[in-house]
Amino acid sequence: MNTSRKEFLGALSLATAFAGCTTAGVKGGAGAPDIRPTRFPPITFDGLEPKPDFWQVRPSEIMALCERATKCSKKEVICHTPLGYPVWALFYGDFSEPAPQTNWSAGNGSTTYHNYYGNRTDGKQTFLFIAGIHGAEPECVAGAMNFIQLMETGRDFRGKADPKLLELASKYRVIVVPCVNMDGRAISPDHLRGLDWINFRRASQGYWKDGSLVGWRGSKAWFPLPLDKVGYPGGYPNSEGYNIMHDACPGDLRTEEAKALLKLAARWRVDAVLNGHSYESAPSVIRGTSIAVPENVQRSKEIRYECNCALHEAGILPQPTPTPDKDKYSPGININNLLALASGALTLTLENTVSYDRPDKPSANIRPTRKYEFTELVDVTMIVLKAYLANGLKRPFVYRGSEKVYGD
């Protein structure tokens, strides 16, 4: 037997080890609402090369893979978007335990953390990977789809086996939400690879009726974006103009997508989250937030460092990454903060890249990027998943001990 065949059979055996059942429980399939037409037609650009077959990012492709997945122990439609698209979550591992008897907030103040976490005997942590909160950013959606295909068949859509990633994932309970903002994905191109900066912004955050850019910062001046004033809203928000990443004000949640993610994390006691996005620079895991469980703030610096070192060693991230003792944190507030408060999870954001050439802007700390190949953009997700999951085996992401850490 040749080496490649041995690797494939080994990977396949690990992939089939996740399920332990032949049929996945499906929630939310029957009686689903019809998918309505988009208010704005999809934006198009001349000169974008056709996507390769392994770049599965269209809503129809996302739905098809989730519907045919069988190696997952369960799968759910956690909500429907305003247009009626299903938002799927696929579960790999044992998710048979009852709901928590309390929530994270109350459990954190009770006599033992086990009142929330329960008394699981397998010791496996729960890892949540979400992608496509911004629908115009397909790179991590492509990564998530290839990861699901790997978990299902032992090879991703490129035909590539990754026994190490499968081995690491088998030591966790894994939940994958391949695309949160299906509405934004429905009006966005398959990719923006090689597109110039102006058109990248047009596709992402949209433009006003006079043709001027809404802009990255500008898009956050509105919640929701006033759709009656735009020529095109971009794939950043959902079809009602809401930026799901910033639907993060307790007591005033506006989107079903954000509510569903928070319920998902709370229900399954998620330990760690990877939130997949894209930006203009070389791919990296960006700074974690300062508004989180204090222990998680420092820990996120350590994991960020290891993930970015892995990207650097793979030749994807060209510049050194700060060591944890010199790293800073972000004062920003977004759904990662609420995910942390929903289950005590450690949360980090991966920024893949749209991969276009732009001039260096030292004053803005923006690095020029090279034009990454499609396969490299998928590799980014796989590399970061491996580094993140490997770190959690050295030390649990969050404290789950029976005794209290503070107070009496």
Which functions belong to the PLM regions below?
Residues K124, P138-V293:
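Active-site/substrate-binding loop(s) of hydrolase catalytic cores
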Residues W88-A89, T112-G118, I335-L341:
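Short, surface-exposed beta-strand/loop micro-motifs that present aromatic residues
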Residues F129-A136, C140:
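Active-site histidine-acidic residue metal-binding/catalytic motifs
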Residues S96-P100, Y117-Q125:
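Proline/glycine-enriched tight loop/beta-turn segments at coil->beta junctions
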Residues M1-T16:
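N-terminal secretory signal peptides and thylakoid transit peptides that target proteins
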Residues G31-W104:
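Short glycine- and acidic-rich boundary segments immediately preceding or forming the N-terminal edge
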Residues T3, A24-Q56, R158, E240-D408:
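C-terminal accessory segments enriched in acidic
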